[in-house]
Amino acid sequence: MNQDHFISIIPGLSDVLGAQSSRQDALELLRNNSETYRKFQSFPAGEQNKLLSFIMGQRGLKITYDSFFQRIMSPELHPGRLESFLSELMGEEVHIEKILPREGIRLAEEASLIIMDILVQLSDGSRVNVEMQKIGLYFPGERSSCYAADAIMRQYTELRGRLKEKFSYKEMKPFFLIVLMEHSSAPFQKAAPGYIHTEKIYYDSGAEVASLAKIKYISLDTFRDSVHNISNKLEAWLTFFSSDEPADIIALVNAYPEFRELYQEIAEFRTKPEELIHMYSEALAIADRNTIRLMIDDMKEELDSLTNQVAEQKSELARQENEIARQENEIVRQESELAKRDDEIARLRAENERLRRETQ
């Protein structure tokens, strides 16, 4: 497809991403720095083509990597953007009061698995952690519960230390954990076409008891498969997070012009190949570590499954052996019973024979 035809079927793309350039110009820009070009050549062919298309201005760039996301959605540089997304997701206007340090059990155990992680405190004291997973992690409920419990306990410790004897549990504020997954894991794929998964806690008696942990998962892959027209601001944000397709960019900017500024900031990387390739290289390295870790998890899960199967088979074999032993014991008992009956019959016959002789 030539460049003129591309522009004609996607009008307005140059207004958002800047004037388009040729493939040769894009390659020359990369070759200006030998180290940058060497890194570029080390990328898989598919990733090279995506980057070239971006530098040429023919498509956008996904920001589902920490380095890119932090540039565009940084609560320090652009608090209004994260506030806008959170307000749409939570159904009420929120304001970020401060950014909190990213610490705790998640970073100790899973730093290489999380490609974006932002923790903020809202004006009402609530805390919100927004994280992006390139590939949905295993055991999402267990992991999220542990992290939420750790975050809530840290809030409790801070309040106890600051308020001392004036502390009351009513001072505790909710902790919101929002997990965006570019490729969601099996439990969420089974819930398609639903793509926003909100944890609900109910008591069978109907009692209403507050819970501080508020957890939401968002399946961006299911969203892309299920939603084809942007009908509200939340869908606009999820489209921005999940798609780099030219048609989606144009549709989004036409529906919500405020996103033009975000795309233009992304487009600035077109003229900064060294920075672009460096950040992309880091992103791919993280993705590789994620893939390796998930492959290990896969193998562990398969090993656990095989171990359970072997245990079940051993248990079944033991049950069958016990059944055989029981049946053998039953046979011995029956044989013993038959032998007793044979002895009794022989005794009765002998008695009958004795009596018959006495009567003769």
Q: Which positions does each model-derived feature cover?
A:
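Short conserved micro-motifs at the rims of enzyme active sites and ligand-binding pockets
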Residues: 189-191, 227-231, 278-279
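Short, hydrophobic/amphipathic alpha-helical patches that form generic packing surfaces
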Residues: 67-71, 179, 217-219, 236-243
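Charged, alpha-helix-enriched surfaces in structured cytosolic catalytic cores
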Residues: 77-81, 139, 232, 257, ...
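Extended serine/threonine-enriched, polar tracts that run as long, contiguous segments within proteins
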Residues: 204-235, 242
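Short, charged alpha-helical interaction segments and adjacent helix-coil junctions
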Residues: 8-59, 128-133, 242-360
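Short amphipathic C-terminal alpha-helix that caps PH/PH-like domains
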Residues: 86, 147-148, 234-241, 263-266
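Accessory alpha/beta interaction modules
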Residues: 1-214
